[in-house]
A protein has these predicted regions:
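N-terminal leader/targeting and pre-domain segments
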Residues: 7-14, 19, 25-29, 37-74, ...
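Transmembrane signal-anchor/signal-peptide helices with a preference for the extracytoplasmic
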Residues: 1-4
Length: 547
């Protein structure tokens, strides 16, 4: 039996390499039948079955990868020939040859596709936005083998939708339109070009996946996908739409150096490893909102030419958005930063909003320039804040913000409108040394200070406006308030509660991991302790409140 199959295999491979279209398609069909026969043969060992089928698949893939010179002739894709009669005759002959070659190759891919398709449960089918999990699908009979299509020019439609590539799929360096859906091993798409739409929605990638250096000319959907290992999209260019909505990244995700020509949305995502977006360019509106980052998030050195929506995010690791340029509004409202956050050296062509957020680590928002207003209204800062050397084109507002440690605003410039510090609470001291207020006096109505901390209110020598100070020693801005002795005691009590909750979160994270139920509960307790303090402080800035 083995000798007979070997002879059929060798003859089929010979015919597949040349001959008529009918002979080559027949040879491909023979190889497919041989593979199915080996899989059904229970007499030979599993290792032998796998080896024989992989050998057949390698031969089929080699046929797909083999170059075909006429596919690179752009004129053959025209509707009508050009030139004299001799050239027209050649056009029709070569185009017929090209169509015939495409027919052979499509038949091979169709046979492969039919045997790598996966089936999902009814529940998953009814909810296309739910990321697939391992138990939600069953693989095809050929899913457990490796496929190498690297460097292929797909000059015909390719349909890999609903496919399960269990041992890896290599599509690196390809030019094609491709709709692959489910991968079980390392998948390499690097350096590929997609001239039309590319749909990878609802995919599961069990191994490391490489999409680096790709070019997408049409609409691209990667949303609703699950990446179990490292995924690399770096250096890619996307067309009118790039969607990564509701995806889960179990390991590191690298989107660095990408260019988005049109709208980009990666909202409602979960990043369990590092998330790297460094050096990317967004030419239209961008949504990176409503997402969870378990480890470090790097969004530094990016350029946003449309509206930037980065609100309602949770950053459990360090956050770095330094050196960015925003042409339009940038929204960072209602975010939680559990570690240090940096916006150093960024430029805002419109307004920046970081309101109603919680910053548990140090914040660096220095050496920034803004044309519009900048607001951190209603936010709470648990560690030191650096606002030094900034230029505000309009006003700066920290109204109702709570600063528990020192705030350094020195050597900044506020141009149009008044800087708004109304009802803010500075519990750890603040410096306005060398600040220049150009248009109006800053407003400190019902602002709350801790008289035990250090303060510097001596603005720049050439400042058009000064901070209006009340009489007394120590002296504070007119309209502001200071904590009473009883208030200082309560502040200490609240901070002790926060420190205990933060310590419990740190211990639980080391013990159970970033995203365990115990850690989520500890984060909730820390947030509750922080909100309790903020609510108490804000009650002191209300009219006629005893402190």
């Amino acid at each position: 039996m083995r000798t007979e199959r070997t002879a059929r295999f060798e003859e089929a491979v010979r015919q597949l390499g040349g001959g008529t279209v009918e002979a080559r398609m027949g040879a491909a069909r023979t190889l497919v039948i041989l593979a199915d026969e080996w899989l059904a043969d229970t007499v030979v060992t599993e290792h032998e079955r796998h080896h024989q089928v992989q050998t057949i698949i390698d031969a089929l893939c080699e046929s797909i990868r083999s170059p075909f010179s006429l596919a690179y002739r752009a004129e053959l894709w025209a509707d009508e020939p050009t030139g004299d009669l001799q050239e027209q005759s050649r056009f029709y002959a070569e185009r017929a040859e090209l169509v015939a070659e495409a027919k052979v190759r499509r038949s091979i891919l169709t046979e492969i596709h039919e045997r790598v398709r996966w089936m999902t449960t009814k529940t998953v089918s009814q909810n296309p936005y739910a990321p697939l999990k391992t138990g939600d699908f069953s693989p095809g009979t050929w899913s457990g083998f490796a496929y190498d299509f690297s460097g292929t020019l797909f000059f015909y439609p390719v349909d890999f939708r609903g496919s399960c590539w269990g041992q890896g799929l290599n599509l690196s360096g390809c030019t094609h339109r491709e709709d692959a859906n489910l991968y079980g091993g390392p998948a390499d798409f690097s350096g590929s070009t997609y001239a039309d739409d590319a749909d990878f929605f609802g995919s599961v990638y069990a191994g490391a996946t490489d999409f680096s250096g790709c070019a997408y000319g049409g609409y691209t959907r990667f949303g609703g996908s699950l990446y179990r290992e490292f995924v690399n999209f770096s250096g890619s260019t996307f067309g009118p739409y790039a969607g990564f909505i509701s995806s889960v990244y179990r390991s590191d995700a690298d989107f660095s150096g990408c260019t988005y020509t049109g709208y980009m949305s990666a909202s409602q995502c979960a990043y369990h490893g590092r998330a790297i977006f460094t050096g990317s360019t967004y030419n239209s509106d961008t949504r990176l909102n409503h997402s969870h980052y378990s480890r470090a998030a790097r969004l530094d050195s990016c350029t946003y030419k449309g509206d930037a929506f980065l609100h309602d995010n949770t950053y459990c690791g360090t956050f770095n958005a330094s050196g960015c340029t925003y042409t339009n509004p940038a929204s960072f409202d209602r975010c939680t930063y559990l570690q240090d956050a940096s916006f150093v050296g960024s430029t805002f062509g419109h307004y920046f909003t970081g309101s109603d957020s919680a910053y548990y680590g140090r914040v660096a928002f220095n050496r920034c320039r803004s044309t519009g207003y900048v607001t951190f209204a209603g936010s709470i800062f648990h560690e030191e804040v650096n606002f030094t050397g900034n230029v505000y084109g309009m006003n700066l507002s920290v109204r109702e913000a709570v600063f528990l440690e020192g705030v350094d605003c020195s050597n900044s410039v506020c141009h149009e409108r008044a800087a708004n510090f109304r009802e803010a609470a500075f519990m750890g001291g603040v410096s306005f040394a060398g600040v220049r207020f150009v248009a109006n006096e800053p407003a400190f109505d019902r602002c709350l200070f801790n008289s035990m901390a250090g303060y510097l209110f001596n603005v720049a020598m050439g400042s058009e406006h000064c901070i209006p100070m009340a009489a007394g020693c120590p002296s504070f801005p007119i309209g502001s308030r200071t904590l009473t002795e009883q208030g200082l005691i309560r502040l200490s009590s609240y901070r002790q509660s926060i420190n205990r909750a933060a310590k419990a979160l740190e211990v639980m994270t080391r013990r159970t991991g970033q995203d365990s139920p115990e850690v989520l509960e500890a984060r909730t307790e820390l947030h509750a302790a922080s909100e309790a303090l903020a609510s108490w402080v804000r009650s002191l800035t209300a009219p006629d409140t005893a402190r």
